[in-house]
C-alpha cells in the first residue's frame, strides 16, 4: 500500500527532514484531519 510506504519513510530519522518527507507529513496531517468527524 502506498500510504504504508510513505509512513515508513516518515519513520526514518534520516529522511524525516527531507523536503519530500515534509510534504508527505503535511499530506498525512491534512488527510487525517479530513477524515475526522
Curated annotation (Swiss-Prot):
Domain of life: Bacteria
Record key words, sorted: Activator, DNA-binding, Transcription, Transcription regulation
Keyword Transcription regulation: yes
A GO molecular-function annotation: DNA binding
Role summary: Transcriptional activator of the mau genes involved in methylamine metabolism.
Entry's family note: Belongs to the LysR transcriptional regulatory family.
Protein name per its UniProtKB record: Mau operon transcriptional activator
Amino acid at each position: 500500500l502506498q500510504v504504508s510506504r510513505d509512513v515508513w519513510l516518515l519513520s526514518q530519522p534520516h529522511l524525516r527532514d527531507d523536503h519530500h518527507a515534509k510534504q508527505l507529513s503535511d499530506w498525512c496531517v491534512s488527510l487525517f484531519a479530513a477524515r475526522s468527524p
